[in-house]
Amino acid sequence: EREKEFEEMATKDKDEKFLIQFKDERNELRFTLASDKIVYIESSDNYCIIKYINNNEVVDFLLRNSLKRLSEELKDTPIQRCHRSYMVNFEHIASLRKDNSEISLEFDVKGIKEVPVSKSYNDKIMESFVKFSKQNSFHLV
């Protein structure tokens, strides 16, 4: 019962941001972060590299888990899959760049490279971009 109370407290903080719990492939809790601290997640073989902000610096956390599994766990969050190797946090997307048929996402965090969007995710990402741009100040480039 106490554990349940802690989980409920951990899901939201004062600013209505929520905490995201990252579990490894064995479903063991490894890392918990406020949603607005996560910039993007990149897959690397059987690992995911979580890029997040800590003391105004972007740092990495290596998690043994698949991007597919993480995308299922995070489906109701602003963190969306945009490529077979990437998930992005729409809380940090500054712009969506369309060059011919290629789409890429640019972040509002210094020193972070833009992330490509696979053609298979184009519609979903455009939909998410419109949805989140109403909440934040994004622009189409």
Show the residue positions of the predicted features.
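Basic, polyanion-interacting recognition surfaces, primarily
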Residues: 2-141
